[in-house]
């Protein structure tokens, strides 16, 4: 099931969720399942004594409005902005238009209108978030929250006139600040409860919207809506969603023409599997020497043996020549050295390396003659702005993160991915704390919710007492009628690579 959710992000950790319509209530029920409400008080062991502490549930969104797949299919020409609403349009009137002024007054701070994508690919590695669209955080709302433990109070600092930990006071203030009758209904939610259950957001919208929501807060706080964001928000929904068979299309990484026309590149030393990036994403990456002719390669090879300085100079000049004649197209150039790109007129958007050179040595075990030059390139990369990771796959994800931040119009596709995805449903919820949904998607594995699962898919039940969860009645009926493949895996004790390999061989 596809979904568009209007939301207002107030902070990274602490916020309130509110219900405006029956549809939103259904969304809460779908996401939360039959889980118990958290206790108002708990105890924490302090040496030999048990100390009572208040239990405050950290949450991250205010849900303003929700439209399901039926609505989208009935209104395929609506844009995201049409559905969510804004002060600049009138069709249809939604919660966004009526509630934003009240929220602004309640928290005594201006709200920024626009689009926002929360944690699709994080700077610390891949992580798929659970909500889709829109509104924006208020400036100066939240200072650093301190969450000492799951059993302790969540301490927050805010410029609001009401204590954010006092749900009753907020209900009362909200009711006085808005004309909406249901505006007094607020509820705290666990982020992971929503995340585990909400696997039904459409992958196409997630992937196509990604580049438009990078650096949103910084850009929007300056008072201008980027054209790319406006274009995405006003694109008809039918162009963002796959409306036919309901199958999720493979994610793609492709470029539109760069308005500036300048070639961009990244620095990645030998032994960092740059060839893997260029072969996996041929529409995005190109190795620095790929356009070189046989004659140019021969001249460079001769100079490399006799005059290293002349070799590097000619190398940069050759890159510059192919930049000028358009041989690199609009792709990102992967180079082993910064000087080659900068001297060749290429804009460097990132420098990357594995944090431990021993990993590089292992990658070059079959090419031992290149280890010395690889070490020289590795040691030359340092200073502010250098991106590192101990794992090559995670480093490549950070490269993709940088690319999507710097190139408007980028959508994610793995060029080596199978044309038909493996469809998998995790009965007990996707183990997001252990595994990367992005990694599964990149390897041709589509994770769907139980109500999306067909008999052609695979149902995975996770072992371990902490993975057991009661299912709502409608989903229990779906489980009993499922006739496809079923498998039980200890997913919490498997690496992501092992999980991908196992699912791929089923």
Swiss-Prot record:
GO terms for cellular component: host cell cytoplasm; viral capsid. GO terms for molecular function: molecular adaptor activity; RNA binding. It comes from the Viruses. Residues 128-249, 325-355 are annotated as: RNA-binding. Pfam families: Phytoreo_S7 (PF07236). InterPro entries: Phytoreo_S7. It is found in: Virion; Host cytoplasm. Keywords: Capsid protein, Host cytoplasm, RNA-binding, Virion. Probable component of the transcriptional machinery present in the inner capsid. Displays dsRNA binding activity and may play an important role in the sorting of viral RNA and virion assembly. Together with the RNA-directed RNA polymerase P1 and capping enzyme P5, forms an transcriptional complex positioned near the channels situated at each of the five-fold vertices of the core. This is Protein P7.
């Amino acid at each position: 099931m596809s979904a568009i959710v209007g939301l207002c992000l107030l902070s990274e950790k602490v916020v309130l969720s509110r219900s405006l319509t029956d549809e939103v209530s259904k969304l809460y029920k779908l996401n939360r399942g039959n889980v118990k409400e958290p206790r108002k008080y708990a105890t924490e062991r302090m040496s030999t004594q048990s100390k009572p502490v208040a239990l405050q549930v950290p949450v991250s969104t205010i849900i303003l409005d929700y439209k399901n797949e039926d609505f989208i299919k009935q209104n395929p020409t609506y844009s995201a902005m049409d559905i969510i609403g804004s002060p600049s349009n009138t069709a249809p009137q939604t919660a966004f238009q009526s509630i934003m002024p009240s929220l602004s007054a309640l928290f005594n701070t201006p709200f920024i209108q626009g689009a926002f994508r929360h944690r699709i690919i994080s700077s610390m590695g891949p992580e798929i978030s659970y909500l889709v669209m829109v509104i924006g955080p208020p400036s100066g709302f939240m200072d650093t929250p301190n969450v000492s433990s799951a059993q302790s109070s969540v301490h927050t600092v805010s410029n609001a006139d009401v204590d954010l930990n006092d749900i009753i006071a907020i209900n009362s203030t909200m009711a006085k600040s808005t004309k909406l009758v249901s505006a007094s209904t607020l509820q705290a939610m666990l982020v992971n409860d929503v995340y585990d259950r909400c696997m039904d957001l459409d992958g196409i919208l997630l992937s196509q919207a990604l580049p438009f929501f990078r650096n949103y807060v910084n850009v929007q706080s300056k008072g201008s809506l980027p054209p790319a964001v406006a274009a995405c928000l006003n694109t008809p929904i039918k162009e963002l969603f796959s409306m036919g068979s309901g199958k999720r299309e493979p994610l793609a990484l492709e470029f539109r023409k760069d308005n500036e026309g300048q070639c961009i590149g990244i620095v990645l030393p030998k032994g960092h599997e740059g060839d893997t990036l260029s072969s996996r994403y041929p529409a995005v990456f190109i190795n620095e020497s790929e356009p070189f002719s046989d004659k140019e390669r021969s001249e460079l090879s001769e100079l490399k043996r006799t005059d290293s300085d002349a070799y590097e100079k000619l190398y940069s000049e050759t890159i510059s020549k192919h930049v000028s004649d358009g041989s690199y197209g609009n792709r990102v150039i992967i180079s082993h050295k910064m000087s080659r790109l900068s001297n060749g007129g290429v804009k460097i958007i990132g420098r990357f390396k594995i944090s431990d050179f021993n990993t590089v040595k292992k990658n070059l075990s079959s090419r031992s003659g290149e280890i010395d030059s690889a070490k020289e390139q590795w040691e030359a990369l340092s200073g502010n702005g250098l991106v590192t990771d101990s794992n090559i796959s995670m480093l490549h994800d950070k490269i993709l993160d940088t690319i999507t931040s710097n190139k408007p119009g980028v959508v994610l596709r793995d060029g080596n991915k199978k044309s038909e995805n493996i469809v998998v449903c995790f009965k007990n919820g996707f183990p997001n704390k252990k595994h990367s949904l992005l990694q599964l998607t990149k390897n041709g594995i589509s994770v769907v919710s139980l109500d999306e699962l067909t008999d052609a898919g695979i149902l995975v039940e996770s072992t371990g007492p902490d993975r057991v969860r009661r299912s709502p009645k409608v989903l229990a009926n779906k489980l009993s009628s499922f006739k496809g493949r079923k498998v039980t895996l200890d997913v919490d004790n498997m690496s992501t690579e092992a999980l991908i390999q196992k699912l791929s061989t089923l």
